[in-house]
Amino acid sequence: MASTANPMQVMKKKLEGKVVIVTGGASGIGQTAARVFAQHGARAVVIADIQSEVGKSVAKSIGDPCCYVQCDVSDEEEVKSMIEWTASAYGGLDMMFSNVGIMSKSAQTVMDLDLLEFDKVMRVNARGMAACLKHAARKMVELGTRGTIICTTTPLSSRGGQSMTDYAMSKHAVMGLVRSASIQLGAHGIRVNCVTPSVVLTPLAQRMGLATPDDFHTHFGNFTSLKGVYLTPEQVAEAVVYLASDDAAFITGHDLVLDGGLLCLPFFAPS
């Protein structure tokens, strides 16, 4: 008779007993990550997001141990309060997945850079990440927790592009933040890493016109060396779980790239 056991019940739960915060957890990669973290045995998964109705619905669908907290990461006081509440409510903080990110609606080329949109993107993507990392680190140090902080970046954090200049700049800033923090927080046993997915089939990608795997291959098939596959939110979430787990106990300051070989493509290829 075939076994009906849940595969996650058979697998090792890599976040057993951990208290975890996911910013941007109401949708996209963050929502999937919250579900995967709960499946991996997290004691508490706090979804921190500005999308209150969606966030509450996601937390309810995941069930115990998940909850939703309203938080605008561009407001440092809200970030601090959210982290304080989490540590007080659940008796600690083991992991921060700083995942929230936005893009401008326009192309944002250098010569047509809308600086109001630029400020908005930098406020969320760079300043917001810094606030999350700062206050998560402070709480972990205060509690003597050898925790882990993981930020979401993009291949544009190490490359330029024909557009999205403000987005690329904001993600370059995140990479610098991660590398600096990994050096400064190592003395406290806190590991800081980032995960760098290329295009994932999420609501953000859908707003770019990528609603299906076929759309992905049409627009980005030539920009990966690995053919016939595409990146899913679940794969990104499992990469984050790895970085947060004891399996990665000696990894800090690392950029775990999930790009199908995009960054390895040659600058010049024979015709």
Curated annotation (Swiss-Prot):
Changing residue 154 to G: Loss of dehydrogenase activity and strongly enhanced cis-trans-nepetalactol levels associated with a huge increase in Km for cis-trans-nepetalactol. NAD(+) binds at residues 24-30, 49-51, 72-73, 99, 167, 171, 200-205. The active site is at residue 167. It catalyses: (S)-8-oxocitronellyl enol = cis-trans-nepetalactol; cis-cis-nepetalactol + NAD(+) = cis-cis-nepetalactone + NADH + H(+); cis-trans-nepetalactol + NAD(+) = cis-trans-nepetalactone + NADH + H(+). Changing residue 153 to A: Almost normal cis-trans-nepetalactone levels. Changing residue 199 to A: Almost normal cis-trans-nepetalactone levels. It comes from the Eukaryota. Changing residue 198 to M: Absence of cis-trans-nepetalactone. Substrate binds at residues 154, 167. Changing residue 167 to F: Absence of cis-trans-nepetalactone. Keywords: Isomerase, NAD, Oxidoreductase. One of its GO terms (molecular function) is isomerase activity. InterPro entries: NAD(P)-bd_dom_sf (IPR036291), SDR_fam (IPR002347). Its EC number is 5.5.1.34, 1.1.1.419. Belongs to the short-chain dehydrogenases/reductases (SDR) family. Bifunctional enzyme that possesses cyclase and dehydrogenase activities. Functions as a non-oxidoreductive cyclase to promote the formation of cis-trans-nepetalactol. Functions as dehydrogenase to oxidize cis-cis-nepetalactol and cis-trans-nepetalactol into nepetalactones, metabolites that are both insect-repellent and have euphoric effect in cats. Binds NAD(+) as classical short-chain dehydrogenase/reductase (SDR), but does not utilize it for its redox-neutral cyclase activity. This is (+)-cis,trans-nepetalactol synthase NEPS1.
